[in-house]
Amino acid sequence: MKEYTLEEFQNELRLGIPDPLPEPQPYDPTVNHAPKRKDILTPAEKKLAIRNALRYFPAKYHKMLAKEFANELKEYGRIYMYRLRPTYKMYARPIDEYPARCRQAAAIMLMIQNNLDPAVAQHPHELITYGGNGAVFQNWAQYRLVMKYLSEMTDEQTLVMYSGHPMGLYPSHKDAPRVVVTNGMMIPNYSKPDDWERYNALGVTQYGQMTAGSYMYIGPQGIVHGTTITVLNAARKLGGGTAGKLFITAGLGGMSGAQPKAGDIAGVVSITAEINPAATQKRYEQGWVDEVHADLDELFAAVNKSIAAKEAKSYAYQGNVVDLWEYCADKGIKVDLGSDQTSLHNPWAGGYYPVGVSFEDAKVMMAEKPELFKEKVQESLRRHVAAVNKLTARGMYFFDYGNAFLLESSRAGADIWNADHTAFRYPSYVQDIMGPMCFDYGFGPFRWVCTSGKPEDLDKSDHIAMEVLGEIAATAPAEIQQQMHDNIQWIRGAKENHLVVGSQARILYADCEGRTKIAARFNEAIKKGEISAPIVLGRDHHDVSGTDSPFRETSNIYDGSNRCADMAVQNVIGDSFRGATWVSIHNGGGVGWGEVMNGGFGMVLDGSEACDRRLRMMLHWDVNNGISRRSWARNEGAMFAIKRAMDICPELKVTMPNLVDDEVLEGLF
């Protein structure tokens, strides 16, 4: 890879799509690539896909590029425009290295490049950050145009993004978002998995997952705090602490890769199965898993020693998760906790691999024999569930981690329903843990990125956050003392847990009061020069208000509205005019295309008084919107939390539900 001077790098960003075009680049086999996508387009649609791709280029290049893009479509199922992939190193540079007329635009450039950093992204050359299909852009022409627009943007313009495509810069004003992102917005009738395959191949939409297409991914750290909370509280359900408990799960990808680290922090022994050797090796080299084994007998010889010693240790099983579960069921192994975080939101395109088929053979099968691949996946899910059922009958606590495991298992005909076939036999982790303990009280995955790139700025921010949480905990009500204690323990140990992959970022579960006070202290520290550069605030879309998803984020909503998407849409609209630097709204994310509506924001803190005003207004809405909806659904914790919020802020007036006695309804129908 060519070494660029700072001036050369900045000129490349300003350039946009080069003319003349760069030479084609060879396919790099050392990088983890996306699997070949399904060949779903008709011949006429393939011509349309080429026509759509060529509109980024002058006519003089059309004949040459038409053949090149046709070959990409044939070989990979998508047009990535590999020729335009930059040859400079892709990572989050210090904010001052980005050529921008507007500080906010420079911060967004940093966040985009972090999402595409090979150390961070799952399939960096295909612009996929995580989840198998969570895209930042559809192709490299879009990336180059976005960087050009951001380098030109003033603080009175807004960049409009249509599913990776930059529609353009439009006049706005200083308090407007600098970027507004939509990903995968479809007419509801056209939101099935094959619709994603077709319209993504045509180059007209994309699946942004959550933080991939919204430029807010911070590596596997992004969910490790939530996963730690989940594992801790799942273990608490069994009693007796976490030491010596065995947790088995699957997935070492961009999000799922947080599981072994979370297990270590929670104090359990964990085994995480992963079929992709490149993903396993990546997490091992990054220190996110302690040992890797491909032989099950050898694996459990080591695991049993860790259990006996009651040491926190993480193991990766390099192989198929079904083989792992069936081994445990057949050998009578005691498993305390079980889950799954394979990408079952994307089951037919690399999110889940069938047992009995090698990884490489499965990739060929999914592209060339998609119906057979689907049959094999569903057969594997039936075996997967059967083994899990045997272990839960012996006392294991199993929970769905919001990856569509229960949903796809039910579609596969697995024995996943309860006795009267009215609900799944296993809870979503949101139903049992995250919803009632965190979301209903306003706690969720708040995050920040120090744009200086300096670890010392991150250290300072950790210290500020710990101080603020300590102050809040001193007078917090009993209902949230456990959450406050867990979060203080988290931030106290954050540095020593070596969580940073990519940008200097931190994840921290916090409620409205915590987020607002931490952000205000950050802004003050930037103003005083105690933190040397702006901080980007954000959160996962998987949060109190950000996502409507009946199989995950809103699975503990029982008033019938768990399939309604008003909350997520209202949230992004409200954030946009209350001061967010950028906002996004996506179809899909977590459980899958057509199953979820989710959104997020980014906010650049620059030390100004205007920023202090915006952060207080926006964060208050961003949390209390979701608490209000959860309260209206009669969730006890949310009713408590929103009443408390109204006491703190007299301007907040929320409609409260009147509870109905069961006797009133008896005998009516």
For the regions a protein language model found, what residue spans apply to each?
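Long, compositionally biased, glycine/small-hydrophobic-enriched stretches that function as flexible linkers
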Residues: 1-201, 205-216, 370-521, 525-538, ...
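Residue-level detector of anion-binding/catalytic polar loops
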Residues: 269, 334, 397
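Solvent-exposed alpha-helices and their adjacent loops that cap or buttress functional pockets
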Residues: 152-154, 170-174, 189-190, 238-242, ...
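Glycine-rich beta-alpha junction loops
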Residues: 277, 319-322, 341-346, 402-408, ...
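Small-residue-enriched alpha-helical segments and adjacent helix-cap loops
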Residues: 535, 539-570
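Active-site/ligand-binding-proximal alpha/beta "capping" segment
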Residues: 314-342, 349
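Catalytic or ion-translocation cores adjacent to nucleophile or general acid/base/metal-coordination motifs
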Residues: 208-232, 236, 242-246, 250-310, ...
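Short catalytic-loop micro-motif centered on adjacent basic/acidic residues
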Residues: 246-249, 312-317, 399
